[in-house]
């Protein structure tokens, strides 16, 4: 079992989510720094960096990486077509005009032009940051999953292998993180093969864990006992494979039906600070380490509304593990 004092905590920071919430990303990030996270996952958004074909703008990501370096925060960098936050696939408009970015009958990388341009973008990001202290490179987000939030669009295992090969060529000692979703329905075994494929490709596997997922405006799906047993078994398999077992998208913000950001009120049924603390403790007892909380931009938004319940809960979170 993970000794609680050795548990490492982190979060994912998304400048895109700041935009959705109407917040300045620099000011928001500076509110996150005092929380003293061990890790922060950053996102290399294709549509932000290469708005115009062949012209790359790294101003935002450069600033975020510099801030992490300044404050000795370990960096996880997510890169690819598919990176954290809606709409999952972050295509520049010029790509959407020349490629099929909505198909579900085949993998998106089946479009040779799209695959070629994506690899050019990934290579640019790798070369930009290959000498920076990136502790893990995340290739795509839920790289092999066909999740509903991405409208069933997906990438092939072969394309993920190409991206990893490209990274290893330029950063031979790089460590690879692949993220996986876990199904809440016991009869759906599709995540098992994806999990095993990911183990073969990565140094660390990050599981995205939610405990209340909306099915309509009033009802939520909650994990059954098999869900926790599967998480325990997956951890055992990762340990036996000498891979790191991370929890990388751990619910710490509301997820509500048909809401890009849930900001109509300050409290929702899908989560709470108390539920978040319970989830972190449960994952720690299952030996997942580090644990990256999902929703730091939301906590800052809450603070701006005069409510400190999330910021205070996160601030206190590390004390039991100190």
Model-derived regions: residue spans:
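Short, acidic/polar
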Residues: 18-34, 118-126, 186-198, 272-282
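Glycoside hydrolase catalytic-domain groove-lining segments
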Residues: 153-260, 311
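Active-site groove signature of glycoside hydrolases
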Residues: 82, 87, 107-114, 118-152, ...
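Aromatic-lined substrate-binding rim segments of carbohydrate-active enzymes
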Residues: 26-34, 41-98, 151-178, 221-227
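Substrate-binding cleft of secreted/luminal carbohydrate-active enzymes
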Residues: 76, 244-322
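Acidic-and-aromatic substrate-binding clefts and catalytic sites of carbohydrate-active enzymes
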Residues: 12-26, 46-59, 83-87, 144-147, ...
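Hydrophobic faces of well-ordered beta-strands that scaffold small-molecule active sites
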Residues: 7-13, 38-42, 75-79, 135-139, ...
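Boundary/entry segment of secreted carbohydrate-active catalytic domains
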Residues: 1-32, 37, 43
């Amino acid at each position: 079992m993970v000794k609680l004092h050795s548990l490492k905590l982190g979060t994912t920071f998304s400048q895109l989510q700041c935009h959705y919430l109407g917040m300045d990303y620099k000011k928001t990030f500076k509110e996150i720094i005092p929380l003293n996270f061990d890790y922060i996952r950053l996102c290399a958004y294709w549509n932000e960096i290469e708005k115009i074909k062949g012209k790359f703008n790294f101003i935002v990501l450069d600033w975020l990486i510099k801030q992490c370096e300044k404050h000795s925060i370990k960096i996880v960098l997510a890169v690819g077509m598919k990176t954290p936050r809606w709409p999952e696939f972050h295509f520049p408009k010029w790509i959407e005009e020349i490629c099929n970015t909505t198909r579900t009958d085949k993998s998106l990388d089946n479009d040779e032009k799209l695959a070629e341009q994506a690899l050019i973008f990934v290579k640019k990001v790798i070369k930009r940051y290959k000498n920076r202290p990136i502790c893990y490179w995340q290739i795509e987000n839920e790289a092999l999953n066909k999740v509903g939030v991405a409208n069933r669009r997906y990438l092939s295992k072969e394309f993920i292998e190409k991206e990893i090969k490209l990274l290893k060529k330029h950063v031979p000692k790089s460590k690879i993180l692949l993220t996986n979703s876990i199904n809440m329905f016991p009869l759906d075994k599709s995540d098992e093969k994806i999990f095993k494929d990911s183990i073969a490709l990565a140094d660390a596997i990050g599981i995205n864990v939610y405990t209340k997922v909306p099915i309509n405006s009033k009802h939520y799906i909650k994990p059954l006992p098999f869900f926790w047993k599967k998480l325990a078994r997956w951890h055992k398999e990762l340990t036996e494979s000498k891979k790191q077992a991370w929890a990388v998208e751990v619910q710490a913000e509301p997820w509500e039906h048909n809401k890009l950001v849930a900001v109509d009120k300050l409290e929702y049924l899908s989560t709470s600070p108390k539920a978040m603390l319970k989830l972190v403790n449960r994952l720690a007892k299952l030996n997942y380490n580090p644990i990256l909380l999902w929703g730091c931009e939301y906590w800052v938004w809450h603070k701006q509304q005069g409510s400190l319940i999330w910021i205070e809960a996160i601030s206190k979170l590390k004390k039991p593990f100190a």
